[in-house]
Amino acid sequence: METTLNHLREGQSARIKTLRMQGAMRRRLLDFGLIEGTRVRCLGSGPAGDPVLYCVRGTVLALRRQDSRCIAVETEP
């Protein structure tokens, strides 16, 4: 099912479909390995719910919810 990265629950995995953003932030996320087909797993969030931690290619990334709303993913069963 297609959704956005911010909708993943802790422990849930998905594959990147597309980045719906432009400019420096898009480039930075691509450099971190957030490209189409890459598996990402939600590890949880900070005490206030933001940022959210994700595991991408063995690296832990902290993304703000507003940024993760711009990343389309396909959830895995």
Language model features with spans:
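Short alpha-helix capping/helix-loop boundary micro-motifs
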Residues: 2, 25-28
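C-terminal structural segments of small proteins and small subunits
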Residues: 3, 45-77
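Conserved positions in beta-strands of structured domains
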Residues: 6, 17, 41-43, 74
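Short, structured beta-strand/loop micro-motifs enriched in basic residues and often containing a Trp
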Residues: 12-25, 69
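Charged, well-structured alpha/beta interaction segments
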Residues: 15, 31-32, 44
